[in-house]
Amino acid sequence: MSLRSEHIWIELIKGSRKISNFCWAFILFVGSVGFLLVGISSYLGRNLISFFPSQQIVFFPQGIVMSFYGIAGLFISSYLWCTISWNVGNGYDRFDRKEGIVCIFRWGFPGKNRRIFLRFLIKDIQSIRIEVKEGIFARRVLYMEIRGQGTIPLTRTDENLTPREIEQKAAELAYFLRVPIEVF
């Protein structure tokens, strides 16, 4: 989503609170709890899961492996739930022609650098760059190239924009900032 006026363009960036992340975190949590319960029930010799008889699973080695997969899945699931709750990657890109400043803000992981805030002068922007990689896993990313600072990604690598959408976005931003477009 973007908000625009004559002199200011604010592009809101969606972080890790996406439906796909919620689905993966939930599926991973349920699956890992299932694996852990099967491993524990094979150790205890009791059915903790009613639709799967624990007598068919021997604790060594199947029960141990299932327990390990369950614990590993719980760690990965809790990592996903933490990134969702902290909303890592959420933020905005603010382009202000009147002030001549570009501000990029993102939320990171908790700690000293939780708030990621970058500020540049518009006159230091060298170009808007489109990077296109075709193939099975096609990828189109929009970058802003800053003199002496390198490139800063403006779109997520998993955003999956069509060639027309990425070109349109790059053209509008380059026109707004009055900088050229480069395609790689």
From Swiss-Prot:
Domain of life: Eukaryota
Positions of transmembrane segments: 22-42, 57-77
GO cellular component: chloroplast thylakoid membrane; photosystem I
Membrane-protein topology: Multi-pass membrane protein
Subcellular location: Plastid, Chloroplast thylakoid membrane
Keywords on record: Chloroplast, Membrane, Photosynthesis, Plastid, Thylakoid, Transmembrane, Transmembrane helix
Pfam families the record matches: Ycf4
One GO term of the biological process aspect: photosynthesis
Role, per record: Seems to be required for the assembly of the photosystem I complex.
Entry-linked PANTHER family: PHOTOSYSTEM I ASSEMBLY PROTEIN YCF4 (PTHR33288:SF4), PTHR33288
Family membership: Belongs to the Ycf4 family.
This protein's name: Photosystem I assembly protein Ycf4
Organism lineage: Eukaryota, Viridiplantae, Streptophyta, Embryophyta, Tracheophyta
